[in-house]
């Protein structure tokens, strides 16, 4: 007969070893290959103390086409919780220039041929409740939101293009216009950003005025109305192409060309909020922004305006409006630029 053996006293050392063995028997935890990066501080609405019923939208930019008298508005400074453009453009590498030599012209010809298909004309013609002023107000709020997320200029251009193209197809109620703005931003970021903003972050910026289901439903509507045709040629693409072109031709030093590109990008950001500039194609706006940036930086060899093969009348008309836009939003522009560029540029360039 088998009887249980008497238990022997266990030493403290043995008990400690047993606990170690128990810990080693735990199931292994599978670690994610791509750890999710979380922000240390949550994004806050740009308007920290919204009024009752206010969704956080505030005026930041002045628009020459909205009947302004040319003076900066009290809220036009981008210093209202918005950081300037992050430094200079990325330095060009030999691989970048070699890639441009191999494929630059063919990519430019392909994107240039697509402009007419993706260019929205008179996007507010069918909008009884959305005006040029409300569009300017929305984008003046959306541009700093885009910058607060640290997103690329390409995604901003795609956001505005998606917004305007949808406006040409469907009337939008005034109380849904901000929802359309953040939905367009989300669609654009999903195309080009590695880490697009989360839906709950975008909804938080709207101060809880909309639900997740409303945003997702509108996203589906926008995609179907645009027939999932989203890869529009942008000002960002043409700015980069013209910068590479002038460098390849030896028309500017690398540092000068990159500074002009950053300044031109800031001017283009201002133009995105003004409905008057929707009549110009992205390639025309890009070459004019770059030419104006050269004059503001007083570069000895400005970019050739005829690189985009646009009529002289259209070039001068666009340049004149851009100069007026810069003069009206001089305070905002200085807050958008790095300090080293602000010290070099003149906010009253001559068009001669």
Q: Where do the protein language model's features map onto the residues?
A:
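Acidic, serine/threonine-rich low-complexity regulatory regions at protein termini
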Residues: 1-182, 186-352
């Amino acid at each position: 007969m088998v009887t249980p053996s008497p238990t022997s006293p266990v030493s403290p050392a043995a008990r400690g070893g047993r606990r170690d063995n128990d810990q080693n028997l735990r199931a292994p935890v599978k670690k994610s290959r791509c750890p999710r990066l979380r922000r240390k501080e949550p994004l806050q609405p740009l308007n920290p103390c919204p009024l009752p019923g206010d969704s956080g939208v505030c005026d930041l930019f002045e628009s020459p086409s909205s009947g302004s008298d040319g003076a900066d508005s009290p809220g036009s400074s981008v210093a209202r919780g918005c950081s300037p453009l992050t430094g200079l453009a990325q330095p060009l590498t030999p691989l970048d220039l070699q890639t441009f030599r191999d494929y630059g012209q063919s990519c430019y010809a392909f994107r240039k041929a697509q402009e007419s298909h993706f260019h929205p004309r008179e996007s507010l013609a069918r909008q009884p409740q959305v005006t040029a002023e409300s569009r300017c107000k929305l984008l003046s709020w959306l541009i700093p939101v885009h910058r607060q997320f640290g997103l690329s200029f390409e995604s901003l251009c795609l956001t505005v293009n998606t917004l305007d193209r949808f406006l040409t197809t469907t009337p939008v109620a005034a109380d849904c216009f901000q929802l359309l703005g953040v939905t367009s931003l989300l669609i654009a970021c999903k195309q080009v950003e590695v880490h697009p903003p989360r839906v709950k972050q975008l909804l938080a910026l709207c101060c809880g005025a909309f639900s997740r289901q409303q945003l997702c439903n509108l996203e589906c509507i926008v995609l179907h109305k645009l027939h999932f045709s989203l890869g529009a040629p942008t000002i960002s693409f043409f700015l980069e192409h013209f910068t590479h072109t002038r460098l390849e031709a030896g028309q500017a030093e690398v540092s000068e060309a990159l500074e002009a590109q950053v300044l031109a990008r800031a001017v283009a950001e201002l133009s995105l909020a003004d409905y008057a500039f929707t009549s110009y194609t992205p390639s025309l706006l890009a070459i004019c922004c770059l030419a104006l940036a050269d004059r503001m930086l007083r570069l000895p060899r400005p970019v050739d305006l005829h690189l985009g093969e646009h009529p002289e009348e259209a070039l001068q008309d666009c340049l004149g409006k851009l100069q007026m836009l810069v003069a009206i939003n001089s305070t905002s522009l200085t807050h958008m630029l790095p300090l080293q560029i602000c010290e070099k540029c003149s906010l009253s360039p001559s068009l001669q």
